[in-house]
Structures are given as C-alpha cells and as structure tokens.
C-alpha cells in the first residue's frame, strides 16, 4: 500500500497565507503524480499526532517560524517521520539571517556589510559607536528582521531621518534585526533540488525592492530564466550558491538569494529551506526551465525526504 503523505500547510507564522497557497499547489501536484497526499494545517491539527494518524512521510509546505526554523524538524525527528527539506540545524541557521551571515563570512563567502541590533540595545538608545558603524554603511540602507521571511518587516532607508521608523517596524517582527548596506542589484535566486542546481533566475521588481507585494501579489515583477548571465558569471554564481548551501548544511531542496552589486561582485542574501510553491514562485519556474513539470518537481522533493 502506498505511503500516506501529510502536506503541512498554513501554520501560525506571518507567512500563513503564502503557505496555504503553496500547500494547495503541492497537494495537487503530488496527487497528479499518484501520491496519497492529505492536507494538514498545524493551526488546526496537533502535528505531534501525525504518526498516530497513519502518516508515513511529511511534505513541509510551511514558511517562516514554526515551519522552517528547525522546531518542526526536531519534532518530526523525535516522531521518526521522514520529512522534506533540510534538517534541524540547517533549517534554524537559514531562518536566522544574522547567523547565516556570520557563518558565511567565517567561511570567506561574500556578504553585504551590516550592523546587528537587539531590541534591548534599541530601547536603551544606540551608543555613539553603534551610530558610527551604521553611518559608515552609507545610504541607502535596508533594515530587516533577522528571523522573518517573505520580506515581512523590511524597509529601504534612503534618508537618515527615516531610520528610526524602519527600526521600529523591524522590531515589531523580531528581537534582533539587521541593518545592511544597500546593494543596487540586480537580484538573482538559485534553486537546488537534491544534487542538481537549477538555472538561475533574475528578479526585476517594479518597485524599490523585492518586497512582499512584489513576491506574491504584483503582476509587474519580471522574472528572467535563464537569467541572462554569460557562462562564466553563471558558473561563478552556481559555485557560490553551492558553497553557501553546504556551509549551512542544507539538504533536500531550497533556494539561495544573491545580489549582484555595481562592482560586479555577487553577495549572498539569504537561504530559503522551504521556499514558496505558489503560481508566482521561483523554484517551479527554474524547474520548468530545466524540463521538470510541477508535479515531477514535488514528487522529486518528496523522494528526497529522509
């Protein structure tokens, strides 16, 4: 008898709506591939009961906290249920932009200059040294929560007097935030499925940057796959992404986002260990370019579950 597969979708994070869309698409794709798949929303069902409910494997279509931050992965490990995507450590590291950057920097990989702040430091008032370090980054800046996805809580700061508001917004979403030097782009993303690096995608948002609206709602965001890089640039990008992926210990499938600055240098932005799988999503787009249908993609991801 075929394995009974739980597709985890929805959840309780700020990315719930995106996850519901991802999960519905994954569910349809798995069923098209002949898989006995069923939707499970952790907001409504106690996922600690998955094994008792007769499930043999889990496809994680959750985004954000409680889904791709290592907590769920740890519980599934304890239950002895194979699941898609990266393990506990890689999931936790990838969700945490600050720790990802520290690890990549330590591995000698390029990341944008940044300053990290905690809520306690912000509430106490920034020291002169912190102000000087932020000032040294120049303008514009990008302010982002360390552990939030889908560009939630992110702001581009073009004038110094807008920084305070941007910090306040980011701290609504996390206790730790990043203030980064603005890289002028373009932005690229590279998906990995198993050992296969899929063709890179160049992202061209209509607005200032690739924010929540550009990712999920706008029809004006343009995606180019192939990305239009020459062969040596594409090879350099793929090599960097693979090094970044391995440094974090990622497995299964995922995506690494990268920015090409005006100096011609690629800089790592972040890793996504449970990327979106909606109609606007990038991993399915790259898979299509590589000759893989959506159904083939989700079945392949499920096969990689351990």
From Swiss-Prot:
GO terms for cellular component: cytosol. It is found in: Cytoplasm. It catalyses: 2 D-alanine + ATP = D-alanyl-D-alanine + ADP + phosphate + H(+). InterPro entries: ATP-grasp, ATP_grasp_subdomain_1, D-Ala_lig_Van_CS, D_ala_D_ala, Dala_Dala_lig_C, Dala_Dala_lig_N, PreATP-grasp_dom_sf. Mg(2+) 1 binds at residues 257, 270. Pathway: Cell wall biogenesis; peptidoglycan biosynthesis. Its cofactor is Mg(2+); Mn(2+). Mg(2+) 2 binds at residues 270, 272. Keywords: ATP-binding, Cell shape, Cell wall biogenesis/degradation, Cytoplasm, Ligase, Magnesium, Manganese, Metal-binding, Nucleotide-binding, Peptidoglycan synthesis. Its main location: cytoplasm. ATP binds at residues 134-189. It is an enzyme of class 6 (ligase). Pfam families: Dala_Dala_lig_C (PF07478), Dala_Dala_lig_N (PF01820). Residues 101-303 form the ATP-grasp domain. Binds 2 magnesium or manganese ions per subunit. One of its GO terms (biological process) is cell wall organization. GO terms for molecular function: ATP binding; D-alanine-D-alanine ligase activity; metal ion binding. Its EC number is 6.3.2.4. Monomer. Belongs to the D-alanine--D-alanine ligase family. Cell wall formation. This is D-alanine--D-alanine ligase B. It comes from Salmonella typhimurium (strain LT2 / SGSC1412 / ATCC 700720). The gene is ddlB.
